[in-house]
């Protein structure tokens, strides 16, 4: 595990962070995904060569709205999904297509190169070709080519490991240089310092491990702010298989005195149930638009930190 080796950084503060889940359902049948991967050669296979089942893909994406200390709002997208048809539906359902057209979304932050977070890029760029895109600097040539062939005409920012990257007051990104299944390298996540509350982190899949991520935030952001909340995939039990070795993750989260846990996507419903049993403050949802349970923040749901 290679994480940023950094000195404490002042990332500033913001008033609040609102996250609207556009889609956390990256696929609709987990067994089919596993079968696709197995047929292609296993978890070390290049994702770009897997013959994915055409009707099983969805995507992961969220709209993030940050209120600055002066009351102004900044909007950006966290990830851009997978299946273009599914993402088109999600964007139109939530009005993201209009926000992109009107220039009200500032940038796209792609957590990592996995297909369900990145391959829906053509839909996003259809509405805003000049949108600024932030990625890690560990993308393979296929990922770079996808950006080009998707019609991107804006600025591409590549963030590397070794330091926290201040994006705007109250918000910073941290990149972990780690190998990930399906031949992906590197993932980064976001930290927000919310005035009067503490640190909030937003993740894609959190392949770096949620405790590693939260440790980095607590130790490397000036002022020793406490952890307040988190949103996103935590990759604890993505295919609903629980093992005893995962128990310390739940205990570790419980020890942090978090105030809001809005985990979804690859966290796993079984992990959500373990969190609830451990009295973690899990934010629940409405189980609509394809999300499978009301026990977590799902498609079309919002959470405010």
Regions found by a protein language model. Name each.
Residues 15-17, 21-29:
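Short polar catalytic/cofactor-binding loops
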Residues 135-188, 284-304:
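Metallo-beta-lactamase
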Residues 113-115, 191, 196-201, 205-296:
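Cap/insert and terminal regions of metallo-dependent hydrolase folds
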Residues 64, 79, 91, 112, ...:
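Divalent metal-coordination and catalytic microenvironments
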Residues 85-134, 221-231:
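Active-site metal-binding motif and surrounding structural segment of the metallo-beta-lactamase
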Residues 73-76, 106-107, 130-132, 199-200, ...:
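Short active-site oxyanion
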Residues 25-29, 34-94, 187-203:
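Conserved beta-strand hairpin/beta-sheet module of binuclear metal-dependent hydrolase folds
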Residues 90, 120-124, 146, 213-216, ...:
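A short acidic, amphipathic alpha-helical/loop segment
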